[in-house]
Regions:
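N-terminal carbohydrate-binding/catalytic regions of secreted carbohydrate-active enzymes
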Residues: 36-136, 379, 383-386
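Bacterial N-terminal signal peptides that target proteins for export
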Residues: 2-12
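Alpha-helical solenoid scaffolds that mediate protein-protein interactions
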Residues: 49, 83, 96-99, 103, ...
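C-terminal functional modules
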Residues: 320-396
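Well-ordered alpha-helical scaffold segments within catalytic/enzyme domains
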Residues: 72-88, 95-98, 138-152, 199-212, ...
Length: 396
Protein backbone atom coordinates (compact mmCIF):
# COMPACT_ATOMS: atom_id res chain seq x y z
CA UNK A 1 0.00 0.00 0.00
CA UNK A 2 2.84 2.41 0.92
CA UNK A 3 4.60 1.60 -2.38
CA UNK A 4 1.42 2.40 -4.34
CA UNK A 5 0.98 5.71 -2.46
CA UNK A 6 4.63 6.60 -3.04
CA UNK A 7 4.32 5.93 -6.77
CA UNK A 8 1.10 7.94 -6.88
CA UNK A 9 2.75 10.89 -5.16
CA UNK A 10 5.72 10.70 -7.53
CA UNK A 11 3.41 10.68 -10.54
CA UNK A 12 1.48 13.61 -9.08
CA UNK A 13 4.69 15.61 -8.63
CA UNK A 14 5.80 14.80 -12.19
CA UNK A 15 2.38 15.79 -13.53
CA UNK A 16 2.42 19.05 -11.54
CA UNK A 17 5.89 19.92 -12.81
CA UNK A 18 4.77 19.11 -16.35
CA UNK A 19 1.76 21.41 -16.00
CA UNK A 20 3.90 24.24 -14.61
CA UNK A 21 6.38 23.83 -17.46
CA UNK A 22 3.54 23.76 -19.97
CA UNK A 23 2.06 26.94 -18.53
CA UNK A 24 5.49 28.59 -18.70
CA UNK A 25 5.79 27.61 -22.36
CA UNK A 26 2.31 28.94 -23.07
CA UNK A 27 3.26 32.18 -21.34
CA UNK A 28 6.47 32.40 -23.39
CA UNK A 29 4.56 31.89 -26.62
CA UNK A 30 1.85 34.33 -25.68
CA UNK A 31 2.24 37.60 -27.63
CA UNK A 32 3.12 40.65 -25.56
CA UNK A 33 1.07 43.84 -25.73
CA UNK A 34 3.85 45.63 -27.62
CA UNK A 35 3.76 42.90 -30.25
CA UNK A 36 -0.01 43.09 -30.74
CA UNK A 37 -0.51 46.86 -30.46
CA UNK A 38 2.76 48.55 -31.47
CA UNK A 39 1.05 51.79 -32.50
CA UNK A 40 -0.61 52.13 -29.09
CA UNK A 41 2.79 51.69 -27.43
CA UNK A 42 4.24 54.55 -29.47
CA UNK A 43 1.30 56.83 -28.68
CA UNK A 44 1.16 56.01 -24.96
CA UNK A 45 4.90 56.40 -24.45
CA UNK A 46 4.77 59.81 -26.09
CA UNK A 47 1.94 60.89 -23.79
CA UNK A 48 3.94 59.71 -20.77
CA UNK A 49 7.09 61.47 -21.98
CA UNK A 50 5.58 64.80 -22.97
CA UNK A 51 3.84 64.92 -19.60
CA UNK A 52 7.31 65.18 -18.01
CA UNK A 53 8.42 68.06 -20.21
CA UNK A 54 8.29 71.26 -18.16
CA UNK A 55 5.38 73.57 -18.85
CA UNK A 56 7.79 76.10 -20.33
CA UNK A 57 9.04 73.51 -22.86
CA UNK A 58 12.29 72.35 -21.29
CA UNK A 59 13.25 68.67 -21.38
CA UNK A 60 15.25 67.41 -18.40
CA UNK A 61 18.00 64.87 -17.94
CA UNK A 62 17.16 64.00 -14.35
CA UNK A 63 20.16 61.68 -13.99
CA UNK A 64 22.63 64.48 -14.79
CA UNK A 65 21.74 67.35 -12.47
CA UNK A 66 18.65 68.28 -14.47
CA UNK A 67 20.62 69.56 -17.44
CA UNK A 68 19.06 70.26 -20.80
CA UNK A 69 20.77 69.63 -24.13
CA UNK A 70 20.03 70.79 -27.65
CA UNK A 71 19.88 67.08 -28.48
CA UNK A 72 17.08 66.54 -25.97
CA UNK A 73 15.12 69.49 -27.32
CA UNK A 74 15.58 68.22 -30.88
CA UNK A 75 14.26 64.77 -29.97
CA UNK A 76 11.16 66.31 -28.36
CA UNK A 77 10.53 68.47 -31.43
CA UNK A 78 10.84 65.56 -33.84
CA UNK A 79 8.61 63.34 -31.74
CA UNK A 80 5.98 66.07 -31.37
CA UNK A 81 5.92 66.58 -35.14
CA UNK A 82 5.53 62.86 -35.79
CA UNK A 83 2.81 62.59 -33.14
CA UNK A 84 0.93 65.65 -34.47
CA UNK A 85 1.27 67.40 -31.09
CA UNK A 86 1.45 71.09 -32.01
CA UNK A 87 0.98 72.36 -28.47
CA UNK A 88 4.02 70.49 -27.18
CA UNK A 89 6.03 71.36 -30.29
CA UNK A 90 5.44 75.08 -29.84
CA UNK A 91 6.30 75.02 -26.13
CA UNK A 92 9.56 73.16 -26.74
CA UNK A 93 10.48 75.39 -29.68
CA UNK A 94 9.82 78.57 -27.70
CA UNK A 95 12.06 77.46 -24.82
CA UNK A 96 14.76 76.30 -27.23
CA UNK A 97 14.84 79.57 -29.14
CA UNK A 98 14.78 81.68 -26.00
CA UNK A 99 17.43 79.80 -24.03
CA UNK A 100 19.80 78.07 -26.46
CA UNK A 101 20.33 80.82 -29.03
CA UNK A 102 23.20 82.66 -27.39
CA UNK A 103 25.56 83.42 -30.27
CA UNK A 104 25.43 85.57 -33.41
CA UNK A 105 23.97 82.74 -35.50
CA UNK A 106 20.86 80.57 -35.71
CA UNK A 107 22.46 77.47 -34.19
CA UNK A 108 21.94 76.22 -30.65
CA UNK A 109 24.13 76.03 -27.57
CA UNK A 110 24.35 72.37 -26.68
CA UNK A 111 24.35 72.42 -22.84
CA UNK A 112 22.15 74.31 -20.38
CA UNK A 113 21.90 73.87 -16.62
CA UNK A 114 22.82 75.22 -13.20
CA UNK A 115 26.31 76.67 -12.93
CA UNK A 116 28.59 76.84 -9.88
CA UNK A 117 26.95 80.07 -8.77
CA UNK A 118 23.49 78.53 -8.82
CA UNK A 119 22.45 80.35 -11.98
CA UNK A 120 20.50 78.51 -14.68
CA UNK A 121 21.86 79.26 -18.13
CA UNK A 122 24.10 77.93 -20.90
CA UNK A 123 27.05 76.24 -19.19
CA UNK A 124 29.82 78.21 -20.89
CA UNK A 125 32.56 76.93 -18.58
CA UNK A 126 31.79 73.39 -19.78
CA UNK A 127 31.79 74.30 -23.46
CA UNK A 128 28.02 74.49 -23.48
CA UNK A 129 28.01 77.55 -25.74
CA UNK A 130 29.27 75.40 -28.62
CA UNK A 131 26.88 73.88 -31.13
CA UNK A 132 26.25 70.21 -31.90
CA UNK A 133 25.49 69.54 -35.54
CA UNK A 134 23.23 66.55 -34.85
CA UNK A 135 20.80 68.63 -32.80
CA UNK A 136 20.92 71.56 -35.22
CA UNK A 137 20.04 69.29 -38.14
CA UNK A 138 17.29 67.48 -36.24
CA UNK A 139 15.75 70.79 -35.18
CA UNK A 140 15.81 72.01 -38.79
CA UNK A 141 14.13 68.81 -39.94
CA UNK A 142 11.52 69.05 -37.17
CA UNK A 143 10.70 72.60 -38.26
CA UNK A 144 10.29 71.51 -41.88
CA UNK A 145 7.98 68.73 -40.73
CA UNK A 146 6.03 71.21 -38.58
CA UNK A 147 5.58 73.44 -41.64
CA UNK A 148 4.24 70.51 -43.66
CA UNK A 149 2.10 69.24 -40.78
CA UNK A 150 0.49 72.52 -39.67
CA UNK A 151 1.02 74.80 -42.68
CA UNK A 152 2.65 77.70 -40.82
CA UNK A 153 5.35 79.44 -42.83
CA UNK A 154 7.30 80.68 -39.78
CA UNK A 155 8.49 77.13 -39.14
CA UNK A 156 9.92 76.89 -42.65
CA UNK A 157 11.63 80.27 -42.45
CA UNK A 158 13.41 79.34 -39.23
CA UNK A 159 14.46 76.00 -40.73
CA UNK A 160 16.03 77.83 -43.67
CA UNK A 161 17.94 80.14 -41.33
CA UNK A 162 19.30 77.16 -39.40
CA UNK A 163 20.32 75.35 -42.58
CA UNK A 164 22.17 78.45 -43.77
CA UNK A 165 24.20 78.58 -40.56
CA UNK A 166 24.81 74.83 -40.45
CA UNK A 167 26.42 75.25 -43.85
CA UNK A 168 28.33 78.32 -42.68
CA UNK A 169 29.51 77.07 -39.27
CA UNK A 170 29.41 73.26 -39.19
CA UNK A 171 30.32 72.23 -42.73
CA UNK A 172 33.77 72.62 -44.22
CA UNK A 173 34.71 72.50 -47.90
CA UNK A 174 37.72 70.25 -48.47
CA UNK A 175 39.09 69.65 -51.95
CA UNK A 176 35.91 71.16 -53.32
CA UNK A 177 33.53 68.89 -51.39
CA UNK A 178 31.42 69.51 -48.24
CA UNK A 179 32.05 67.60 -45.01
CA UNK A 180 29.94 67.73 -41.84
CA UNK A 181 31.83 68.39 -38.62
CA UNK A 182 30.64 67.70 -35.08
CA UNK A 183 30.01 71.36 -34.31
CA UNK A 184 31.21 74.92 -34.70
CA UNK A 185 34.24 74.04 -32.53
CA UNK A 186 35.49 71.16 -34.67
CA UNK A 187 38.04 73.11 -36.73
CA UNK A 188 40.11 74.27 -33.76
CA UNK A 189 42.95 71.81 -34.48
CA UNK A 190 44.89 70.71 -37.54
CA UNK A 191 42.58 67.69 -37.90
CA UNK A 192 38.82 68.19 -37.81
CA UNK A 193 36.51 66.28 -35.46
CA UNK A 194 33.67 64.18 -36.88
CA UNK A 195 30.97 62.15 -35.16
CA UNK A 196 29.54 59.67 -37.72
CA UNK A 197 26.28 59.39 -35.78
CA UNK A 198 25.61 63.05 -36.62
CA UNK A 199 25.18 62.24 -40.33
CA UNK A 200 21.47 62.73 -41.13
CA UNK A 201 21.37 60.78 -44.39
CA UNK A 202 17.56 60.70 -44.49
CA UNK A 203 17.32 64.49 -44.09
CA UNK A 204 19.72 65.63 -46.80
CA UNK A 205 17.38 65.08 -49.79
CA UNK A 206 14.78 67.14 -47.89
CA UNK A 207 17.28 69.87 -47.04
CA UNK A 208 18.29 69.95 -50.72
CA UNK A 209 14.72 70.87 -51.68
CA UNK A 210 14.28 73.46 -48.93
CA UNK A 211 17.75 75.00 -49.35
CA UNK A 212 18.79 74.46 -52.99
CA UNK A 213 21.58 77.05 -52.72
CA UNK A 214 23.75 74.53 -50.86
CA UNK A 215 24.96 71.10 -51.97
CA UNK A 216 23.17 68.85 -49.48
CA UNK A 217 23.27 65.85 -51.81
CA UNK A 218 27.02 66.34 -52.09
CA UNK A 219 27.14 66.32 -48.29
CA UNK A 220 25.21 63.06 -48.27
CA UNK A 221 27.79 61.56 -50.63
CA UNK A 222 30.80 62.58 -48.53
CA UNK A 223 29.02 61.48 -45.34
CA UNK A 224 28.58 57.96 -46.70
CA UNK A 225 32.21 57.96 -47.83
CA UNK A 226 33.44 59.03 -44.39
CA UNK A 227 31.18 56.51 -42.66
CA UNK A 228 32.30 53.63 -44.86
CA UNK A 229 35.98 54.45 -44.36
CA UNK A 230 35.57 54.99 -40.61
CA UNK A 231 33.82 51.63 -40.33
CA UNK A 232 36.16 49.52 -42.46
CA UNK A 233 39.57 51.02 -41.59
CA UNK A 234 41.47 49.74 -38.50
CA UNK A 235 41.98 53.32 -37.21
CA UNK A 236 43.84 52.91 -33.88
CA UNK A 237 43.46 49.10 -33.78
CA UNK A 238 45.14 46.26 -35.68
CA UNK A 239 41.93 45.40 -37.50
CA UNK A 240 38.35 46.60 -37.89
CA UNK A 241 35.32 44.79 -36.51
CA UNK A 242 33.22 46.57 -39.15
CA UNK A 243 31.35 48.70 -36.66
CA UNK A 244 30.88 52.47 -36.90
CA UNK A 245 33.01 54.39 -34.37
CA UNK A 246 31.76 57.00 -31.93
CA UNK A 247 34.36 59.55 -33.04
CA UNK A 248 36.96 60.09 -35.76
CA UNK A 249 38.91 62.97 -37.27
CA UNK A 250 39.59 63.92 -40.86
CA UNK A 251 42.93 65.19 -42.15
CA UNK A 252 41.96 68.26 -44.20
CA UNK A 253 44.96 67.85 -46.49
CA UNK A 254 44.74 64.15 -47.37
CA UNK A 255 41.04 63.57 -46.50
CA UNK A 256 42.11 60.45 -44.61
CA UNK A 257 39.91 59.35 -41.73
CA UNK A 258 42.05 59.00 -38.61
CA UNK A 259 41.49 58.38 -34.88
CA UNK A 260 40.04 61.33 -32.94
CA UNK A 261 42.58 63.87 -31.77
CA UNK A 262 40.92 64.41 -28.38
CA UNK A 263 41.77 61.87 -25.67
CA UNK A 264 38.22 61.81 -24.30
CA UNK A 265 36.83 60.71 -27.67
CA UNK A 266 37.21 57.10 -28.78
CA UNK A 267 36.70 54.88 -31.80
CA UNK A 268 34.54 52.45 -29.82
CA UNK A 269 31.08 51.47 -31.01
CA UNK A 270 28.96 52.69 -28.12
CA UNK A 271 26.33 55.22 -27.09
CA UNK A 272 27.00 57.58 -29.99
CA UNK A 273 27.70 55.18 -32.85
CA UNK A 274 24.65 52.93 -32.44
CA UNK A 275 22.55 55.79 -33.81
CA UNK A 276 24.25 55.32 -37.19
CA UNK A 277 22.27 52.10 -37.66
CA UNK A 278 18.94 53.82 -37.07
CA UNK A 279 19.80 56.79 -39.27
CA UNK A 280 21.01 54.69 -42.20
CA UNK A 281 17.99 52.39 -41.94
CA UNK A 282 15.66 55.40 -42.03
CA UNK A 283 17.43 56.61 -45.18
CA UNK A 284 16.56 53.28 -46.80
CA UNK A 285 12.96 53.45 -45.57
CA UNK A 286 12.40 56.96 -46.91
CA UNK A 287 14.58 57.15 -50.01
CA UNK A 288 15.63 53.57 -50.86
CA UNK A 289 19.20 54.80 -51.28
CA UNK A 290 21.24 51.73 -52.23
CA UNK A 291 24.19 53.07 -50.24
CA UNK A 292 22.12 52.57 -47.10
CA UNK A 293 21.40 48.88 -47.59
CA UNK A 294 24.94 48.23 -48.83
CA UNK A 295 26.34 49.83 -45.70
CA UNK A 296 24.03 47.89 -43.37
CA UNK A 297 25.02 44.64 -45.06
CA UNK A 298 28.68 45.45 -44.41
CA UNK A 299 28.25 45.77 -40.65
CA UNK A 300 29.92 43.07 -38.59
CA UNK A 301 29.99 41.86 -34.97
CA UNK A 302 26.40 42.52 -33.82
CA UNK A 303 24.79 39.84 -35.99
CA UNK A 304 27.47 37.34 -34.97
CA UNK A 305 27.03 38.22 -31.31
CA UNK A 306 23.26 37.77 -31.47
CA UNK A 307 23.53 34.44 -33.28
CA UNK A 308 25.92 33.18 -30.59
CA UNK A 309 24.38 34.67 -27.44
CA UNK A 310 20.95 36.16 -28.30
CA UNK A 311 22.36 39.43 -26.98
CA UNK A 312 25.16 41.92 -27.48
CA UNK A 313 26.92 44.47 -25.30
CA UNK A 314 26.77 48.25 -25.14
CA UNK A 315 30.39 48.90 -26.09
CA UNK A 316 32.79 47.25 -28.53
CA UNK A 317 36.28 48.34 -29.39
CA UNK A 318 36.83 49.14 -33.04
CA UNK A 319 38.38 45.70 -33.61
CA UNK A 320 35.08 44.08 -32.56
CA UNK A 321 36.15 42.94 -29.08
CA UNK A 322 33.64 43.57 -26.29
CA UNK A 323 34.72 46.42 -24.02
CA UNK A 324 32.05 45.78 -21.36
CA UNK A 325 29.62 43.08 -20.30
CA UNK A 326 26.70 45.50 -20.06
CA UNK A 327 23.57 45.48 -22.20
CA UNK A 328 21.66 48.61 -23.23
CA UNK A 329 18.02 49.16 -24.10
CA UNK A 330 19.01 52.20 -26.15
CA UNK A 331 21.43 50.22 -28.28
CA UNK A 332 19.00 47.34 -28.79
CA UNK A 333 16.40 49.88 -29.95
CA UNK A 334 18.84 51.66 -32.23
CA UNK A 335 20.00 48.38 -33.75
CA UNK A 336 16.48 47.06 -34.28
CA UNK A 337 15.99 48.85 -37.66
CA UNK A 338 19.31 47.43 -38.87
CA UNK A 339 18.21 43.89 -38.09
CA UNK A 340 14.73 44.48 -39.52
CA UNK A 341 16.35 45.14 -42.90
CA UNK A 342 19.20 42.61 -42.97
CA UNK A 343 17.84 39.80 -40.76
CA UNK A 344 14.08 39.98 -40.04
CA UNK A 345 14.19 36.83 -37.90
CA UNK A 346 16.76 38.33 -35.55
CA UNK A 347 14.74 41.55 -35.51
CA UNK A 348 11.67 39.61 -34.41
CA UNK A 349 13.62 37.87 -31.65
CA UNK A 350 15.25 41.11 -30.49
CA UNK A 351 11.97 42.99 -30.42
CA UNK A 352 10.32 40.31 -28.29
CA UNK A 353 13.20 39.59 -25.91
CA UNK A 354 14.72 43.04 -25.48
CA UNK A 355 12.15 45.69 -26.39
CA UNK A 356 8.55 44.50 -26.02
CA UNK A 357 9.11 43.65 -22.35
CA UNK A 358 10.04 47.26 -21.64
CA UNK A 359 6.40 48.32 -22.03
CA UNK A 360 3.84 47.98 -19.22
CA UNK A 361 0.34 48.00 -20.70
CA UNK A 362 -1.26 48.62 -17.30
CA UNK A 363 0.82 51.71 -16.54
CA UNK A 364 0.87 52.70 -20.23
CA UNK A 365 4.53 53.50 -19.70
CA UNK A 366 7.89 51.78 -19.43
CA UNK A 367 7.98 48.73 -17.20
CA UNK A 368 11.07 50.06 -15.40
CA UNK A 369 12.75 53.46 -15.04
CA UNK A 370 14.85 54.53 -18.03
CA UNK A 371 17.06 57.58 -18.30
CA UNK A 372 16.24 60.44 -20.66
CA UNK A 373 18.42 59.07 -23.48
CA UNK A 374 16.97 55.56 -23.28
CA UNK A 375 13.39 56.86 -23.11
CA UNK A 376 13.95 58.61 -26.43
CA UNK A 377 15.87 55.91 -28.23
CA UNK A 378 13.64 53.06 -27.14
CA UNK A 379 10.73 55.15 -28.44
CA UNK A 380 12.54 55.64 -31.76
CA UNK A 381 12.99 51.87 -31.95
CA UNK A 382 9.33 51.20 -31.14
CA UNK A 383 8.25 53.86 -33.66
CA UNK A 384 10.39 52.35 -36.43
CA UNK A 385 8.81 48.96 -35.73
CA UNK A 386 5.30 50.44 -35.76
CA UNK A 387 6.01 52.40 -38.97
CA UNK A 388 5.25 55.65 -37.17
CA UNK A 389 8.21 57.59 -38.56
CA UNK A 390 6.85 58.87 -41.89
CA UNK A 391 8.63 61.36 -44.11
CA UNK A 392 6.31 64.27 -43.36
CA UNK A 393 7.84 66.32 -46.16
CA UNK A 394 5.69 64.25 -48.50
CA UNK A 395 2.49 65.66 -46.96
CA UNK A 396 0.48 67.73 -49.43
Amino acid sequence: MEIILSKSLTLAVILANFLVASLDLIQLDRPLFAEIYPEAVVENLWIAYQDKIQKDGRTLDRDKNYITTSEGQSYALLRAAWMDDKETFDRVLKWTNHNLKKRDDQLFAWLWGQDQNGRWDVLKNEGGINSASDADQDIALALIFAYKRWNENDYLEQAKEILTDIWRKEIVILHGKPYLLAGNWSKENKSYTINPSYFMFYAYPIFAKVDPANDWLGLKETSYQVLQEATSKPLDWKKSGNLPPDWVSIDPNTLKIIPPIYQDKKTDFSYDAFRVLWRVALDWEWHKDKRAIEYLNSIGTLKDEWEKHSSFYDTYHHDGAAATKNESSSIYAGAYPYFSLISPQIAKELYRKKLAKLYDSTAENFSRPLNYYAQNWVWFGFAFHAKKLPNLYLLK
